[in-house]
Amino acid sequence: MSSLYVPLVLRLEVRDRTKIVQSFIDDSKAGSESPLAGERTRQRLVKKGNTPPKKELKGREEDPPIGVMSSEPSHNYHKGRRTYSEVVIESLDGEKLVDSSSSVAGTSEKSGGRSVSEGPPDQVAYYSGNPLTEKTEGIMHFYKYNDEKLTKVAQCRMLCMYAVPAQVEVREIISFMCISLPMIVSIKVVRDPAPNQYMLIIKFKEHNDAVTFYEEFNNCPFNDLESYCCTLFFVDRIECTTSNDLFSSDDTSLTELPTCAVCLERMDDSVLAILCNHSFHARCLEQWADNTCPVCRYVQSPEVVAEQRCNDCGMSNDLWICLICGNIGCGRYAEQHAQRHWELTSHTYSLKVGGERVWDYAGDNYVHRLIENGADGKLVEYQRESNASFDDKNQKGGDKLEGIKLEYTLLLTSQLEDQRKYFEGLRHDMEQTMSKMEKTAYAQVENLEHQLTERSTELKSLKGDLDDTVTARKVAEKRATQTNEKVNKLANELKDEREINQMLRKDQQVWKGQVEKLIESQKTARTEYEKKIEDLQSQVNDLLMHFETQNKLKEQLDAGKITQEEITESQVELDSSSSSSRKLNRKKKK
């Protein structure tokens, strides 16, 4: 029940009209509550790492809350089947424990230092019984707060040492925690009906003393020889009340801690609730081999009652059971399977199922009235009557039944001999059957071994084929890898070539347009040049004619055939035929 700072409330429920145990009414609150005291204590315990690690469960992240109750007040409480047991409470004073532990060594010195002259006292006080021990009948309840605020503000000055094994005595516990005795105010030893264990309620002077004690001793072994550990939890207050007051109270701030149905311990942490709303410790439920709830299975599942039926026909009435082998058969007023069993096995006696009558098939009568006398071991006749006394039963025997006893002994011997022969026959048949089964098993084993050899050969060949296939697969994978590399390389080259071709096509279109433009411009320029050449050629012809005419006129002028005045006043005319012939001559020359 180890947990972090979770203060609990211990409540002793006593039987009605029973005296309240006044020593079990104590409130550890010092009167001043701090709203952050519980939170500081929780953080302190977390830093110390005092609590044992909880086992993590697959499929859930956190443990479900324990004992979640409705916030609305409810008075529909039912006591149910309640068993009140004896509860013994022993109170120990902390100061006396310290004094007794410190004065053990000096007891002899104090006794030796007493004055010899002192006489015995005149009056001595005495009391009857043990005033430190109180007994009552009740049930111990453990509660926790529903409201987290109450948990945070609680400053617990009490600790409960729970489930102390009976092998560890109280004096061993006191020596175990002797270092902390000066911090202890009182100790209450509570022995409830829990078998082989008890618990201690330790009250401290201050809240910090309780926390320090919890940090030092929680989950610590009591000694080095045994594996029992000290289990502590904080207690806010302890109460004692009657059952009527308990069930008539309107206190909804507390929730009672349930008890694990497996280990019978109180559940505080590592609690697992299943679909039927029954709660267990996680470690206890893990040890349950079945997949059903143990509580539901115990409460709801009835005991399996074997119904007696005839082994041959299944009839459930008028049944007789063989006293030798236990075979169950129907009577002679049904299918007579019990009599057939006697005919087959020679088992003479059968007992009426559900009755006390024994039938002898050999003598064809009842033999259940012959019993053996307890005084001398003789057989006597027994007649069962409803109101017969034990004395009447013993008075019916006599010496006259000595022969009946001998006859019964011989009959029993013969029946045992028949039984021996019958079972020897069964054993012989069983041996033959086992021999046949053994031979069949040997043949099956040989067949299985042959099949196993064939399967082993096939397996070896398949393994060889598998190795070859694996090798071929590796080679094919290598080739495929190389081919993929080549394909990737060629794809890259093809991509580059396509890009180059695309660029060349673009350049070709550009150059083609430029060539067409050049051709057109060349044609235009050629036409213009031809026109210019024709003009220039005509100008040259005119100049040549001018020069030729000028030379002729100069010659004629020199020869005196023409005068200067005639040249000035003359007009020169050219024929169109001559000009056209000149043009043709020019074209031919070209």
Curated annotation (Swiss-Prot):
Q: Which Gene3D superfamilies match?
A: Zinc/RING finger domain, C3HC4 (zinc finger) (3.30.40.10)
From the Swiss-Prot or TrEMBL record, state where the protein is found: Cytoplasm
Q: Might you give the EC number(s) for this enzyme?
A: 2.3.2.27
- Which parts of this protein are zinc fingers (UBP-type)? 294-386
In which residue ranges is the amino acid composition biased (Basic and acidic residues)? Answer: 53-63
Gene Ontology biological process terms from the UniProt entry: positive regulation of gene expression; protein ubiquitination; Ras protein signal transduction; response to oxidative stress
As its record notes, the protein acts as a catalyst of: S-ubiquitinyl-[E2 ubiquitin-conjugating enzyme]-L-cysteine + [acceptor protein]-L-lysine = [E2 ubiquitin-conjugating enzyme]-L-cysteine + N(6)-ubiquitinyl-[acceptor protein]-L-lysine
Q: Which residues cross the membrane?
A: none
Listed GO cellular component terms? cytoplasm
For the protein in the UniProt heading, the enzyme class is transferase
| Function summary | Acts as a Ras responsive E3 ubiquitin ligase. Controls the stress response to increased levels of reactive oxygen species (ROS) by modulating the brc-1-dependent expression of cki-1. Modulates expression of phase II detoxification genes such as gst-4, gst-7, sdz-8 and ugt-13, in a transcription factor skn-1-dependent manner.
This one is known as BRCA1-associated protein homolog 2
Species per Swiss-Prot/TrEMBL record: Caenorhabditis elegans
Q: The organism's lineage?
A: Eukaryota, Metazoa, Ecdysozoa, Nematoda, Chromadorea
